[in-house]
Amino acid sequence: MPPPFVVTLTTSAQNNLRDQLKEKNFIFSQPQNTVFQARSNTVTCTLYPSGKLVIQGKGSEEFIEFFLEPEILHTFTHARVEQDLRPRLGVDESGKGDFFGPLCIAAVYASNAEILKKLYENKVQDSKNLKDTKIASLARIIRSLCVCDVIILYPEKYNELYGKFQNLNTLLAWAHATVINNLAPKPAGDVFAISDQFAASEYTLLKALQKKETDITLIQKPRAEQDVVVAAASILARDAFVQSIQKLEEQYQVQLPKGAGFNVKAAGREIAKQRGKELLAKISKTHFKTFDEICSGK
């Protein structure tokens, strides 16, 4: 794990940091002798009354390079990522942990070094580091450069498939294998595919690819979104998720908060009360514990 990163912020930078971390859905608390502590799955930011900011966590280097320096400190001193210019395919998903809305799976095929250089030049990175407006603009660039495929499983279809597979990782493997198969060159040659290892066993996704008779080398690893092509796929998946949520909100005239926290459960209760459980089932992932709790009045 990288060592802690320490920097002193001005008052305006502190306020800017707090606002932007809230937009990124960091979880806030206030341990003793701090102004605040904000956490994501990979980064912890602790701000002290002196203005000292301490950043820790396995995702701290990427957080500093792609967010803190350009957006808060307005510097660019952190080490650059070495460019990997090998043609490859990346795949990622969005919406897996969101109660409302679809599961979106995207694949991106960067077929040559020039395309890859442009992805690096445009600072393509893990969508979790980006605001939704930045995601939308990068998604347009990625679609103009790369061959792309996106599957959007709206809740009704998602729930149907979950009923068939009875396991989220098996469903994810089927969806990942589908977009990989759709984009993989035939024959694949030296082109390979990269995916996050979302299941305990690498065999879960490999088995799904074998069923489709997809002949391509597959690399599965934790935090695969550090790779620029997987990051591009994460951006397309997130962009599709955000647009799909908006579409559902317009179609059913409801507000659908992202995530699976207290505000999401409160919104679900209100929808079930005002519009019925049948509508709730059309716009949410019904295997979530949240759905049963809402329907049982907990």
Swiss-Prot record:
Signal peptide: none annotated. InterPro entries: RNase_HII/HIII, RNase_HII/HIII_dom, RNase_HIII, RNase_HIII_N, RNaseH-like_sf, RNaseH_sf, TBP_dom_sf. SUPFAM superfamilies: Ribonuclease H-like (SSF53098). Its EC number is 3.1.26.4. The keyword Transcription does not apply. A divalent metal cation binds at residues 92-93, 196. One of its GO terms (cellular component) is ribonuclease H2 complex. It catalyses: Endonucleolytic cleavage to 5'-phosphomonoester. Gene3D superfamilies: Ribonuclease H-like superfamily/Ribonuclease H, TATA-Binding Protein. Residues 86-298 form the RNase H type-2 domain. Keywords: Cytoplasm, Endonuclease, Hydrolase, Magnesium, Metal-binding, Nuclease. GO terms for molecular function: magnesium ion binding; RNA binding; RNA-DNA hybrid ribonuclease activity. Endonuclease that specifically degrades the RNA of RNA-DNA hybrids. This is Ribonuclease HIII.
